[in-house]
Amino acid sequence: MIHPQKRLALQLAALGLAAAALAACGKKEEAAPAAQEPPPAPPAAAAPAPGEPLKVAFAYIGPVGDGGWTFAHDNARKAVEKHFGDKVATTFVESVPESADAERVLRDMARQGNQLIFGTTFGYMPHMLKVAADFPQTRFEHATGYKTAPNLSAYDARTYEGAYMAGIVAGAMTQSNTLGVVASVPIPEVIRNINSFTLGAQSMNPAVNVKVVWVNEWFNPPKETEAATALINGGADILMQNTDSSAVLQTAEKLGKRGFGWDSDMTSYGPKAHLGSAVIDWSPYYIHTVQQVLDGKWSSQRLWWGVKEGAIDLVSLAEDVPEAARARLKEVKDGLKSGEFHIWKGPIQDNSGKQVLAEGQTADDAFLGGINFYVQGVEGQVPGGTP
C-alpha cells in the first residue's frame, strides 16, 4: 500500500465527497502541513523501567504481505528493531479496519503498556484522537492525518515527488505518447500524484497525454487489473498506479507493456515490465520518532517528509532507462534535497486552460493539500471536482 492535511471539510467539499464516502473507501489521505498553534505539552511519559525496552506498537490497515503500503510500514518497523536492538520491543496488528475495531485495537495497545503507538491510515484519525485523550502518557503517531493533540502527532510522505520522478522515466520511454494511471480514491493526495506524474513526463516529452481510471478503493487487485487492462486497450504503453497491490505491474507484464511499482519495490512482480518503483521509506521517520521518545524530547507536531529527508525515492531502474532520463533524475533529486528545485512551479495550467500557478510562482503546502483539478495533459475530469 501513502503519506498530513488540514482543511478536510473544504477539501471534501471541493471534491464533492461526503465524509462517510471517504471513510467507506478506507485507507489514507494526506494532510498538507501548514502553520498551526502548537498543542500544549503532554504530561511526562512514563519512561521504561531500568533495563526494560521501549514498547512500540503499529496498527496496519492492510496485510503485511500486500507488497505496497503496509509492507513499507512493516519494513520500517523492522528497521527500528535493527537500529535500536534491545532498547525497543515492537508489535503490530495487521488488517485493522477503519471502524470501531480500530479504536479497540488502539486501546488494547495502550492498555498493554505500549509507550509509542503508530496508526498507519487516514481513517484511524477519530479513533486515535479518542484513545489518545484517554491515555495522556502514551505517545501516538498518525500517518496521513491532519489533526493533532498534546500526545498525538501527524506525519506523511511527499509521494508526489516519487510520482514526478516516475513521470520523467515514462516521458522518456513512451512510444505511444499515452500514459495510464490506475487511481484509487479521488482525494487531493491521489490527484496531486497523477498531476505530478504528468508534469514529470511532460518535462521530458511535451507531447504525452495521461489517461486515468479510478477504482475507488485502495486495495482491490481484481479492479486494479481491470483498470490496467482498460488503459492498455486505450493505448497506454506505460502505467503508473496509486493503489496498493502489485496487480497493475503484473498486468503490464502479462500484456507486454511497462509500469512502475508504488509504495514499495515491486520489481519481482513484473521484472520485464518494471521501469522503477516510487517507494516510501518510513524508517527515517520511525527511527527519528523513537529516538525522540527515548531522549525525552518527543513533542506533538505535523511533518511531511520527502526526498530531502530520505523518505521518498525512485529505485531499481530498468537497464533500458536512457541516460538522459537518468541524468534528469539526478538533477531533480539533488534539487529536491537542496531545496533549489520545485515540482510545482509556474506557469502551470489545468486541463481547461486556466492558469493555476503564474510564471515563477511556487506552490506552498496549503496549495498542494487542496488540489482538485487535472493539469494540462490529463484527460477527463476529476470525479466530483473541476475539469
Residue ranges of model-derived segments:
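Bacterial signal peptide processing site
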Residues: 25-29
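Segments of small-molecule ligand-sensing domains
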Residues: 295-387
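An alpha-beta-alpha
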Residues: 77, 164-212, 302-323
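Hydrophobic alpha-helical segments within soluble ligand-binding/sensing domains
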Residues: 155-177, 278-297
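Periplasmic-binding protein-like
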Residues: 113-121, 141-143, 234-243, 260-262
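Flexible loop/hinge segments that line or gate small-molecule binding clefts
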Residues: 133-157, 264-272
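Extracytoplasmic "Venus flytrap"
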Residues: 46-51, 55-76, 80-84, 91-102, ...
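N-terminal export leaders
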Residues: 6-10
